Amino acid sequence: MKLTTKMPKGERIVSEIKKKIEEGTLQEGDRVSTVREMTKLFDTSVSVVQNALQSLVKDKYLECKGKSGYYVRKQAAKKAVETAAEEQTEQNKPIPFIVIHHNDLVWRRNFDEYDEIRRKQIKLELEMSRKDPRFTFGIEQSAVLERYAEQEPGDVKYLQQLIDEGRLEPSGAFSIQDLNLVSGEAILMCHLHGKKYYKEVWGCDTPVASLTDAFGLCSQIPQILALSGFQYLIPGRLNNRDQKALPFPADGVFRWIGLDGTPIYVTAREGRYTGHGIGREGGSVVNTDNVTRVTNMLADAQNDPSDYIMIYTTEEALIIENLSEIMDNLNRKAARKIAYQNAKTYFEAAEKENIPQVYGEFNPTLTGCYTTRISVKMDNRKAENQIFEAELLDLYRKGKSKDFTPVWKQLYLIGFHDAICGCHTDHANEQIREKLDYVLKETAPAKANLKDGTFTVFAMNQKNGIQLASAPVPPAGIPSQKDGDAYLFEFDGAFTVKKYQTAKKKPAAAKKCSAKFETDYYKVNFSNGIARIENKNGKNVFGNDFGELVLRPEYGTMWQEEYKGAKIVRRDDTEEKLVSCEEGPVFFKVVTEGFIKDGLPEIGNIDNHWPGFESLSFRKEYIFPKHADHFKLKLTVDFHGRNTKTYINFPTTVDCHTAHPLYQVPFGSMERKPYFEIPSNETDSAQFLAHQSDYESAKGDWPALNWVDYSDGNGGLTVANNGTPSHQLKSGNIMVALLRSGTRILDGNLMPEVGSFENGIHEYEFAFQAHQTQDVTKAEQLGQLVNHPARVIAETLPEGDVLSFSQENVAISAIRKSENGILVRVYETQGRYASISMSGSLLKGKTVFNAEADGTVLEKENAAELNFKPFEIRTFILK
């Protein structure tokens, strides 16, 4: 039975009369309809009409003059008109309206195909702007405008005219990157590039950033945008938002406070878009006519008194050519008008005092993206690492400095959200791989000349204490040990250079040893092929079966996980054996190999264990330095099949009820509680996502960059990686996602292709460090160690510390040449105020200046006293 609710007739009479008074249809002294007339008009009884009229008399809207009838009171008419005028002023405020295509640079088509799509879109917008001098449109990435100007140089003059008039609004960075999977330095550089291009080429200093469709917003985005010169943001997904501070829907703008306290003004209604597609009303009425769809959405907007900017967007389609005609027709019928306006004007006029304030991040969402096509993410990390080292070493190369701008531009394209997330076609992936190959080639380390019997090692990481350096030849005078094609030896010094003589004799080969051994820091036992590890200092933080592989059936899309059934493959379904255990003068090396045993399809009806899974084998190579406070694991996995998600599990003894799960984020770290599949007795360890719809796109994982750390009051464990961002720190376990291969269709009706399943061999590297107290600086150092190990360099550098700080809570993000000197960018890692001195050979003969993020020199600084706010990003120029 369908239930309907109607307003009682007496209330309806009151409402209608009040409305006519407020609209001015009934003026002061006017007589309202008679009781008899109203009984017919409203189809009701005399008593209902009389009660309604008496109610209006009581509220001082009407006065009764006996047999003459009821009349509008003077005070009521005046008050109603004033109130209505105030409301009319707000409600009649024009709706700012702009056309901004969301231009995917790569996704279900490749880069070249999207170039042509955008060319046609912008051509049409230029035609429409010539026909209608009001028409206003925007471009959300500088890569789009830059490419179009190359394609259509004849339009450049007119583009400039539109920009000068405010009818074409450039906004945002070079590209809209994924803000969880690329480094903070890459995000900042990408925004600086976009800002610089708009300013230098078009004379446009846009204050509006655009991150539409970004898969989550990390907590340092406000500071990054502010450092790049942006004041306002058109956001992407605002997932897991604080519902009290920012309910959905919310109007106007809100103030987003980042990790360091920097604010940015953001449009609140991320859903305020109109576009094409299939519009459904209650699942029954379907509208596929884009003209009708856009018309109806704009008409609906005219009935909404809220303060917002309306954005008409498509991805690949052309916009409706008669848009201005539709708008004019609607404006003739409605009190609230729609008016073309750019986002800057909207933001500048928006209320900014009594507005919501939101802190932190907008994560997680589309968590499958953290693992899909893992090789793209791992090679992007490698490319970021190499460009950091290449720019640093370029300071010491002879001759003309290398221009890294073309390399950075390709890296921005790789970091585009639909590229690095892996959710694209195999055809698109080919071009992404080409760009990765280009960046890796252009930043590859120069080959050192070893013929003179000497070599130089540079530890481009801030790890204090002993670490292992590698060289293609053994050093003289100190112990070394061969591992593959390299010789490993102890190196002590953070961001330090040392020179070595080449040994005349190769060291003796490592010898077979017991599977049970000790280093200065760890007790290790591989007697049955399964890792049993204990730290020797303080409470043991290692759990049993360290490095266990965990597989589960996963039938999601490339973006979203979807788990079917409870079948999980773990140790009981795994065959693993000890292959070798060796000892040399520098380290112990343990190798195990194994595979997932065949099993019946308990979940589903075909294949091995479940539909889609075929096989997985693996090899683990552990390196335990004898005198270092950490150890490493090289994991090789050979996977075949689909519909499978693979983790490696590092169990700990951390008490999940009092634990602090920390994840490195761009330019900082955040504590994030588990939120999915929480055991019923551990709900006190969890957080719950703000809205049930958040769970549709998030299934347990959180993103991290170089490291995660899991600790309680008695100690903890840091795990560093070389490009595997997807983690779960839950129930005392550190789970790292290695591979996933969902087969379901989602956005763009993309059928996941064979390439997205990543069948074949994959290599991963991890490092581990137990600790007794939570210390983010040690985690930061371990993450740097994995990604920038001490190695031989071809360049000539003075021995000693290149750059050092008096405290450990400052991390180096970049060292490169700039127009004004040497740019050094660092950030505070522990979330505390600090006064720190900076020293090292890099500063020799140079003065330190505070600088803008783009290298613009500001005031002189005292290198002996550099002040940092919590999580502050600072840029210095040395000259």
Task: Give names to the regions the model predicted.
Residues 122-142, 149-170, 245-297, 518-519, ...:
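Active-site cores of enzymes that catalyze phosphoryl transfer or operate on phosphate-rich substrates
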Residues 85-182, 186-189, 198-200, 227, ...:
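N-terminal catalytic cores of secreted or lumenal carbohydrate-active enzymes
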